[in-house]
């Protein structure tokens, strides 16, 4: 099962959506306020769109087909929160139309979850 999840994550990394690519431009290589993110990162039996493991923050992008997955996402979010993660969800059109606000919201949560020096 673990090998299957890792294989699926690898495939998803190769086939990011346009909005995932746009967001990854900011989050990759510690470009985003020096926070390290992983894309399509497996946690338990789930694959997270973007994860900052040090702050335990998950960023998920949802598209139009997403309305069909509400119950699944609710279970998934509950499980992740029980494991100490905070899950931030954004619609793809928010990345397209309001990218700066999305980035501000992510940074605000990262700063809130990170220990002060």
From Swiss-Prot:
Q: Which Gene3D superfamilies match?
A: VSR Endonuclease (3.40.960.10)
Q: Which InterPro entries does the protein's record reference?
A: DUF559, Endonuclease_DUF559_bact, Restrct_endonuc-II-like
Q: Which domain of life is it from?
A: Bacteria
Q: Name one Pfam family in it.
A: DUF559
The entry assigns this protein to a family as follows:
To H.influenzae HI_1162 and to HI_0925.
Instruction: Tell me the protein's name.
Output: Uncharacterized protein YcjD
Identify the gene encoding this protein: ycjD
